[in-house]
Amino acid sequence: MARIAGVNIPNHKHAEIALTAIYGIGRSRAQKICDAANVVRSVKMKDLTESDMERLRDEVAKFIVEGDLRRETTMNIKRLMDLGCYRGVRHRRGLPLRGQRTRTNARTRKGPRKAIAGKK
């Protein structure tokens, strides 16, 4: 298995798909990386030469991925919570942030239902 940005990349997948194993790289960014590195998107990772792999590593290094991206995201959320703004309060309470209704639905964000005694 090849290692790019500290992640084991699956050998049996096409280069474009295999790059999406890295946190912060989706399909469109993977396509741009392959094009910039002059790597054919449809070639399997195991068939790439070492120079191709090096070019891919250099292109991926230009982006914020993996641990740095996770850290940046958590720091942004923590900043909102410390500010005490509306979005920060919603994060703190575990409720939806973007104006969705909460009287019904919002189960994913709120978690499983909590039983309330005498609610009948």
Swiss-Prot record:
Question: Know the name of this protein?
Answer: Small ribosomal subunit protein uS13
User: One MF term from GO for this chain?
Assistant: rRNA binding
UniProt superkingdom: Bacteria
PROSITE patterns listed in its UniProt record: RIBOSOMAL_S13_1 (PS00646), RIBOSOMAL_S13_2 (PS50159)
Which Gene Ontology terms describe the biological processes this protein takes part in?
A: translation
* Family per similarity comment: Belongs to the universal ribosomal protein uS13 family.
Entry keyword Hydrolase? no
Q: Which UniProt keywords apply?
A: Ribonucleoprotein, Ribosomal protein, RNA-binding, rRNA-binding, tRNA-binding
Any one GO cellular component localisation term in the record: cytosol
Residue ranges for the region (Disordered) are 94-120
Any matching Pfam family: Ribosomal_S13
Organism, scientific name: Aromatoleum aromaticum (strain DSM 19018 / LMG 30748 / EbN1)
Purpose: Located at the top of the head of the 30S subunit, it contacts several helices of the 16S rRNA. In the 70S ribosome it contacts the 23S rRNA (bridge B1a) and protein L5 of the 50S subunit (bridge B1b), connecting the 2 subunits; these bridges are implicated in subunit movement. Contacts the tRNAs in the A and P-sites.
Q: Which Gene3D superfamilies match?
A: 1.10.8.50, 30s ribosomal protein s13, domain 2
Q: How does it assemble?
A: Part of the 30S ribosomal subunit. Forms a loose heterodimer with protein S19. Forms two bridges to the 50S subunit in the 70S ribosome.
The record, for NCBIfam families, names: uS13_bact (TIGR03631)
